[in-house]
Amino acid sequence: MRKAHIFRQTKETAIDMEIDLDGSGVYQIETPVGFLNHMMESFSKHSFIDIKLKAEGDIDVSYHHLVEDVGIVLGQAISKALGDKSGINRYGFAILPMDEALVLCSLDFSGRGLFFYDRKDLRGKITEFDFELIWEFIKGFALESKATVHIKILDGHILHHIAECSIKSLAFSVRQAVAKQDKGILSTKGLL
């Protein structure tokens, strides 16, 4: 059973998440940040990972803590559910469009949590949501899932589309990488 439950509480946030890697993309997402809900629903749907999430935080200060911490907990949950990573594809990649936006994501559950992205110049708001929080979310996910993640924005000018396309391409890449195979651990070292 490739499932995990993580509860994380700090002075800034309280997050309770359950996942099933072998699900069908069923989700129950409850946070006080509408755009974060939308992104988590999209991640669940396109990764085929069932996600139950209840999260709250000091959004009166900023959305930053909550968004970053949800990414952290998602990464922790996936890492826990994968165990020693035996029998997974390890790698995943996608180039996905959303209207004018085109985003590439490449992912490796290598055991090394790293995140690289381009277009650091993109700034702005999606309703009350700061666009750059998408990068904080993915960075938290990458570090805690121990995955190397690359995101390249190939085209686009509407921030909502770029953000959503980034999350969907990440989800699609995760779906490929966690898919089962019967060749053991895909590493010449013998572990990930």
Swiss-Prot record:
Keywords: Amino-acid biosynthesis, Cytoplasm, Histidine biosynthesis, Lyase. GO terms for cellular component: cytoplasm. It comes from the Bacteria. GO terms for biological process: L-histidine biosynthetic process. It catalyses: D-erythro-1-(imidazol-4-yl)glycerol 3-phosphate = 3-(imidazol-4-yl)-2-oxopropyl phosphate + H2O. Pathway: Amino-acid biosynthesis; L-histidine biosynthesis; L-histidine from 5-phospho-alpha-D-ribose 1-diphosphate: step 6/9. InterPro entries: IGPD_sf, ImidazoleglycerolP_deHydtase, Ribosomal_Su5_D2-typ_SF. The keyword Secreted does not apply. This is Imidazoleglycerol-phosphate dehydratase. Its EC number is 4.2.1.19. It is found in: Cytoplasm. Belongs to the imidazoleglycerol-phosphate dehydratase family. GO terms for molecular function: imidazoleglycerol-phosphate dehydratase activity. CDD domains: IGPD.
